[in-house]
Amino acid sequence: PIFTEAGIEVLVRESKSLADLKETMTRLRQGASDILLIDSISHVWEGFLQSYAEKVRRTRLEFQDWGVIKPTWKREFSDLFVQDPYHIIMNGRAGYEYDNEKNADTGKREIFKSGIKMKVEGETAYEPDMLVLMERFEEVLGDDKKIWREATVIKDRSTILDGKTFKNPSFENFVPAIDAMLENPLPRDAFAMPEGDTGLLFRT
């Protein structure tokens, strides 16, 4: 209903397949639309891992598998995400990052929560121009219950909103950064300079 009220046509494809997402991105690259919404990229990542595990007939991934998984994800999604000439808005589930340290009293190593990250391939969450952490808060004082949400800007390429937090955020909170990043956009058919061959730098 939100898009209908705004007069925006929305095409929906319900899928958790990276192959389907890649096909959709190809169509946008050809001009089918200017904006791609992905909800959520965590589902696509989990489906990608499951498909790989089924292909190699394993129930658990092994260390050497990541030497295939990560480059494939980068080639089939992350590189396109960065290079394609349209806008992408995606969300993902939040998960904890864990680290370990030695307990000075017991001498044993203990695992602890060291931060929060998006549940997706490790580098993917840092590719967007803007990264926002959404959190839900609840406060109960007697019979009075307050619920609100906060958006913390983890990364803002424009630097205008970097590090800011908004309570019950709306689109208006993000307009300054969005306007800054949309200034002087490249045309869809902009010429891309080919990258130099770094391999020539190695002496073998």
Features from the language model and the residues they span:
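Interfaces that engage single-stranded nucleic acids at replication/repair/recombination sites
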Residues: 1-5, 11, 16-27, 31, ...
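Conserved inter-motif catalytic segment of the P-loop NTP-binding fold
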Residues: 1-75
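Serine/threonine-rich low-complexity intrinsically disordered regions
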Residues: 4, 62-65, 70, 103, ...
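Hydrophobic transmembrane signal anchors and adjacent membrane-proximal interface regions, especially
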Residues: 10, 61, 79, 113, ...
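Arginine residue identity/basic-tract feature
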Residues: 13, 27-29, 57-60, 75, ...
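Low-complexity, flexible helical/coil segments
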Residues: 24-28, 70-79, 128-134, 188-192
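Phosphate-binding/switch region of NTP-binding enzymes
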Residues: 79-174
